[in-house]
Amino acid sequence: MKKNTTFGNAWMHRQLINMLRFVDERFIYVFTWTMIMPVCLLLNTNHSRSHAYRFFRNRIGLGRWSSAWHTYLNHCLFATVVIDRFAMFAGKRFDIEQEGTEYLRELAFQDDGFLMFSSHIGCYEVAGYSLTPPGKRYNALVYGGEKDRIMEGRQKQFSEHNITMIPIKEDMSHLFKINEALVNHEIVSMPADRVMGSSKTIPTEFLGKTAHFPSGPFAVATMRNLEVLAINVIRISRKKYKIFVVPLAYDKQASRKQKMEQLAKKYAEELERLVRQYPDQWYNFYDFWADKNAEPSIA
């Protein structure tokens, strides 16, 4: 899988964070929407425009003009949540609404560790890492090749919430750290909608067509019959995000293959529910329903 990092170099990221300490982020929103996004969509260098348009046209079922308009909105919202992430690094805070967090608190007081599956809808990083229940150490699986400034910002935020980063490595050594965390009855958070490292997938019905979800997260969960929560964070309005926490049940007495398929199906159903409710915040800019070897165009 091709791995891409957040747009811009370290100097640009540093200046943006410094600017956001003093400038209302709405000015940067408008500049990005009007000056940057139209150029990016016109050039379409990473094919994100094409993939987004087909998503709205074929999977959501919109007309041609409506699909084109929502492709623009989708890219503007993506830029907005990226800016919000840098605003968070600059020390700004957002109002967080929560739904279903009682499931998280319940699992926090059980002996075993558990998994939290995120996805590329909304912006998990703005609020999801604030869900750190007492009594258990929290480990977040992150892409290890990100720009230094992004990793520094993450580390600062994570240290405030007692979170340990597990960077994804080409040599797959992160799997040992995941295993160690779960053996120690800790929490591990990871995205479950994008293939990273291994090419093994589970074909699952998603938005009316078979999609290939990575088998890794579901294999980790079912190996120990762990409890799993789907956690997604959606941008509701300016300065406000909403956290959705949903338990993903599966038959722990079934065969390993059946357990993985059941868990992938439950995850896909919850993801589809949110995607249909907030289609403009779907940020998997590649053909999610193509051959399993298709490569994402941006992270």
Which functions belong to the PLM regions below?
Residues M1-S118, Q155:
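Membrane-anchoring hydrophobic helices of lipid-metabolizing enzymes
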Residues K2, F109-Q110, P133, E160-H161, ...:
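Non-catalytic C-terminal accessory region of glycerolipid acyltransferases
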Residues W11, S48, I96, E170, ...:
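Soluble or luminal CAZymes and related metallo-dependent hydrolases
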Residues G63-S66, H70-N74, D112-E170, V195-K200:
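Catalytic core of membrane glycerolipid acyltransferases/transacylases, capturing the structured
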Residues I96-E97, I121, K147, I168-D171, ...:
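A conditional alpha-helix N-cap/helix-loop micro-motif detector
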Residues E97, T164-I166, V246:
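General small-molecule cofactor/ligand-binding pocket signal
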Residues T101-R105, G128-Y129, R154-Q155, I178-N179, ...:
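Short amphipathic alpha-helical segments and helix-helix/interface helices
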